[in-house]
């Protein structure tokens, strides 16, 4: 509904109370507030009825007959928000990394007795603190590009998968931003604590990203539920144990040539091979999903209702979502590198895919 809350003189209308949320950890330029309504009547013509209407006789009507399709059609705006939030979060992570890496390249500390002090970035441990997050930033950048393009060119049939992917990426990226900025702050020492260096503001403003547009843990459960649903569709009414054994067998066969656990191949070129990495991520995703399906079926067979079984399964379901998103991000990162024509840039990006 469209609900007027003030008159033409901007006075609050009767029955309506407007309050400010108060000072927050960050984003204080955003005017978050509370509105309450007490016996406020809303005219019928104020109803937003693009996807559903109520007739004069009080009957519900909709041009979209399927309840499921109507629900996901109306979720379109929410999905857009879940794409915008991680893009904003990733921008903050990139900024923090730029500040921390540039600072550590200039900040000198210790060195050989007869030589000048060396940049902090020269220390392997410092590289291990920051470079994995830099690799993450590239992987997440290309993954979010992929999601954005799919959303912009979506069809109704794609919406459930896009909604699940957006939910998962929102959680994955905002958690990564939280961890990235914390590591950047610590890697800059006391300088990272100074407001003039911006990391504190970046941390404060992005902290809320892990819970608005949906709590991250709940969103990951949504993603996992979608993956289990897709898993079930692929195999129809097959026995879950049969499905598990089939998928495991297929996955092991597909990866056997490049799986060091199967072939005992510990050659450096093999272990650093990009296709091996992607095969391994795919294998992991399939195995975790199949094992979760089998476990869920057993819980239900043992007498738990589906609600309680899902409650027991939540930690396992988060692993499904993690494995799925790990694979998608690596897949899109690798695809972007393959399309890069600048050979010098391609070499650097290839290295970053390996770090990821």
Where are the predicted features?
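Flavin-dependent oxidoreductase catalytic core characteristic
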Residues: 2-356
């Amino acid at each position: 509904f469209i609900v007027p809350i003030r008159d033409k003189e901007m006075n609050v209308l009767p029955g309506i109370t407007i309050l400010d949320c108060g000072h927050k950890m960050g984003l204080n330029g955003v005017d978050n507030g509370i509105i309450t309504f007490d016996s406020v009547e809303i005219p019928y013509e104020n109803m937003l009825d693009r996807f559903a209407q109520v007739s004069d006789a009080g009957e519900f009507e909709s041009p979209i007959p399927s309840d499921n399709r109507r629900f996901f059609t109306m979720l379109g705006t929410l999905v857009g928000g879940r794409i915008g939030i991680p893009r904003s979060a990733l921008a903050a992570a990139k900024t923090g990394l730029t500040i921390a890496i540039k600072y550590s390249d200039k900040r000198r500390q210790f060195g050989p007795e007869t030589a000048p002090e060396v940049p902090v970035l020269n220390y392997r441990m410092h590289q291990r603190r920051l470079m994995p997050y830099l690799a993450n930033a590239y992987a997440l950048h290309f993954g979010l590009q992929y999601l954005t393009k799919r959303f912009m060119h979506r069809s109704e049939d794609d919406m459930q998968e896009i909604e699940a992917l957006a939910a998962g990426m929102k959680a994955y990226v905002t958690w990564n931003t939280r961890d990235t900025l914390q590591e950047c702050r610590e890697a800059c020492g006391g300088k990272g604590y100074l407001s003039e260096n911006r990391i504190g503001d970046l941390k404060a403003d992005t902290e809320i990203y892990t819970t608005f547009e949906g709590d991250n843990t709940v969103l990951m459960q949504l993603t996992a539920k979608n993956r289990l649903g897709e898993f079930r569709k692929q195999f129809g009414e097959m026995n879950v144990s049969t499905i598990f054994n089939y998928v495991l067998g297929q996955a092991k066969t597909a990866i056997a040539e490049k799986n060091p656990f199967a072939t005992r191949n510990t050659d450096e070129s093999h272990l650093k091979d990009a296709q091996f990495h992607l095969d391994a991520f795919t294998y992991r995703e399939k195995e975790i999903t199949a094992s979760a399906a089998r476990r869920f079926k057993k819980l239900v067979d043992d007498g738990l209702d589906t609600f309680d079984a899902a409650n027991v399964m939540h930690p396992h379901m988060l692993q499904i979502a993690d494995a799925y998103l790990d694979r998608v991000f690596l897949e899109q990162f690798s695809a972007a590198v393959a399309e890069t024509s600048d050979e010098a840039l391609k070499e650097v990006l290839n290295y970053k895919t390996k770090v990821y």
